[in-house]
């Protein structure tokens, strides 16, 4: 069990000490060798597998703590670990180790007429603060990604996942020690008091460079409202799929059922289905039947109700609701123009997909829809750093900063300029 500290000044003292240790660890970590970082990551993966029984036992305690509460099934799913998920956690860390090291990469270079040679080079951000709720796997993903990018990280888990996160964190520290890297490079806040979150949002006396929240809408909204440091975040995953009249119906059914029902509680799950009005007679009923057969509840627009009067009517609130459950809103729209208008009105700018064979429809969708991730003829559940080949992700960002979409190792870097001269002076 994590230690507890009474709220008040002691929390600030504790958190500022954590910040100082993280900042001190970030300095040598910023120029640690690729070999040392990869050695630590592989040792972390080994430790997670070796301690699987302990991790699962601690996770069982976390799950027991929420028995009898009115938690959504999606919440319980995010909190739950099993043999497969622990193995995937270790595999994800190894995948991060296998990635190219972004630190020191020359991302642009040019010569000036005066002979100066200029390079733009990737550098670590410094210290990342990650605040998360019911996802114990974030402990491993965030710790590994930050390490690979040369950053120290301060992890603050929710009380619901505290035992699981502590067990995983112990494995990460073993990996750091085995590779001779600073053990304070990955720290887990040892208290569940919410004052610790407030301290992190204030930046821990200048120690934290970026905050990444992973959790529900209320957590993310608080972080975005109160943070005094930059934030990489998305408020919610209100994802849409538009099915054009040109879409292959069998493909559309397969994609939509997967996008909704594979895992209903993740931010990449589709929440609204938009069907081309020109396809009511060919596509709408098969799509509704496929979703219903898969166990999904449908909230239907007036036009959809005319075709399927037994469905539950959608309210205005439904179009802006992230269900995180086996529920989907369905509307008929006036072609690609209607789909874009609906998405612009209700989207959270996370992930949208178009199912179509008409290249002009796809091109317009990709040009005019301004969400972080756009897919053509593929499930929205591919909105994931691992699926993008990033090894894992620390989160999905929907803002307009340099980190947008899955936040992987490259997005956890900044850059500096190196300018080589031969005695030039400015006239």
Curated annotation (Swiss-Prot):
GO molecular function: glutamate-5-semialdehyde dehydrogenase activity; NADP binding
E.C. numbers: 1.2.1.41
Domain of life: Bacteria
Class of this enzyme: oxidoreductase
Gene Ontology biological-process annotations: L-proline biosynthetic process
UniProt KW Cytoplasm keyword: yes
Record family assignment: Belongs to the gamma-glutamyl phosphate reductase family.
Subcellular location: Cytoplasm
Signal peptide: none
Pathway membership: Amino-acid biosynthesis; L-proline biosynthesis; L-glutamate 5-semialdehyde from L-glutamate: step 2/2
InterPro entries according to UniProt: Ald_DH/histidinol_DH, Ald_DH_C, Ald_DH_N, Aldehyde_DH_dom, G-glutamylP_reductase_CS, Glu-5-SA_DH, GPR_dom
Main subcellular location of this protein, as a coarse class: cytoplasm
Reaction(s) catalysed by this chain's protein: L-glutamate 5-semialdehyde + phosphate + NADP(+) = L-glutamyl 5-phosphate + NADPH + H(+)
Transmembrane segments: none
PANTHER family from the UniProt entry: DELTA-1-PYRROLINE-5-CARBOXYLATE SYNTHASE, GLUTAMATE SEMIALDEHYDE DEHYDROGENASE
Species whose genome carries this gene: Rhizobium johnstonii (strain DSM 114642 / LMG 32736 / 3841) (Rhizobium leguminosarum bv. viciae)
Record protein name field: Gamma-glutamyl phosphate reductase
GO cellular component, one term: cytoplasm
Protein task: Catalyzes the NADPH-dependent reduction of L-glutamate 5-phosphate into L-glutamate 5-semialdehyde and phosphate. The product spontaneously undergoes cyclization to form 1-pyrroline-5-carboxylate.
HAMAP family for this protein: ProA
Gene3D superfamilies given in the database record: Aldehyde Dehydrogenase, Chain A, domain 1, Aldehyde Dehydrogenase, Chain A, domain 2
Keyword annotations of the record: Amino-acid biosynthesis, Cytoplasm, NADP, Oxidoreductase, Proline biosynthesis
Keyword Oxidoreductase tagged: yes
